[in-house]
Amino acid sequence: MKQEKYGVLMVNLGTPDAPTPQAVRRYLAEFLSDRRVVDTPRLLWWPLLRGIILPIRSPRVAKLYQSVWMEGGSPLLVISRRQHQALAARMPDTPVELGMSYGSPSLRSALDKLLAQGVTQLVVLPMYPQYSCSTTAAVWDGLAAQLRDNRQLPAIRFIRDYAEHPAYIAALKHRVEQSFAEHGEPDRLVISYHGIPVRYANEGDDYPQRCRATTEALIAALGLPEGKIMMTFQSRFGREPWLTPYTDETMQGLPAQGIKHIQIMCPGFAADCLETLEEIQEQNREIFLHAGGEAFHYIPALNDDPLHIDLLEQLVGKVE
């Protein structure tokens, strides 16, 4: 009987190779060319992307990356590597590789390493707690594209999401309790998720429901009154309506309601990145304090916390 060989592929979004306009432009060109991310007809989108968006946004975004860049690369890459190393250490007899949907390390390189080790049973773990067509489904598309020319395919177990997994909720709860112990209980705990266009949800993407499921499970775990926690959406892009309420507009309005002390977390991000460290911890903090807020504390992502690695290990299962 054929001996099966298991392997694990961890996948996150990706990152530029450097905080420079040129590197950011290459990354954004790949990212924003994915139809799962932007589904505007190509004849309209290509001139807009290459003629306006990339020339204007690349230098701006490069400056933002410069403000959070770490010695080993972008925060997302550095932390993803730590997560990869920690999970691999838990599973010494199972190949574990990290790939990115856009940029390096690529899905192709990660798959090549796994297949070269004779993997016949592949567990694919997109590092997105809440399913969305623009993230999780893009991993599926990328995986299929990379395997299209292979004569021999591994059996694949694809983890769609883990929005309500008990170990995920327990890890989030622990993060919140740590923050409350350090900074006191806030007037509001804000749960900010990356947004998507409303149209995507209307067309069947159940991302809003998955975000709500996480929020409701966390409310129950913390035992806080529902009015103590609010859910918002960040990082909107383009002109069409995105999921609301918007995080930045919420930050602007809360102090006028007498809410002067907030703590904010972004449970949709498995690793801290530009959207959490710069957009939330810097931009939204400034908005809140300028509007009259008095205390703003960002609760870090789960990153390589041991409780997070416990979760990842449970998700991929015992595959030795």
UniProtKB/Swiss-Prot annotation:
Q: Provide the function of this protein.
A: Catalyzes the ferrous insertion into protoporphyrin IX.
What's an example Gene Ontology biological process for this entry?
heme biosynthetic process
Gene from which the chain derives: hemH
Q: Specify the pathway.
A: Porphyrin-containing compound metabolism; protoheme biosynthesis; protoheme from protoporphyrin-IX: step 1/1
Principal location: cytoplasm
Q: Which Gene3D superfamilies match?
A: 3.40.50.1400
* Annotated GO CC locations: cytoplasm
Keywords per UniProt: Cytoplasm, Heme biosynthesis, Iron, Lyase, Metal-binding, Porphyrin biosynthesis
Pfam families annotated for this entry? Ferrochelatase
- The answer, when asked if Membrane is one of the entry's keywords, is no
The UniProt GO MF terms for this protein read:
ferrochelatase activity; metal ion binding
* Reactions catalysed according to its record: heme b + 2 H(+) = protoporphyrin IX + Fe(2+)
Query: What EC number(s) is this enzyme filed under?
Result: 4.98.1.1
Q: Where in the cell is it found?
A: Cytoplasm
Sequence positions that bind Fe cation: H194, E275
Cross-referenced InterPro entries: Ferrochelatase, Ferrochelatase_AS, Ferrochelatase_C, Ferrochelatase_N
* Species: Pectobacterium atrosepticum (strain SCRI 1043 / ATCC BAA-672) (Erwinia carotovora subsp. atroseptica)
- Name recorded for this polypeptide: Ferrochelatase
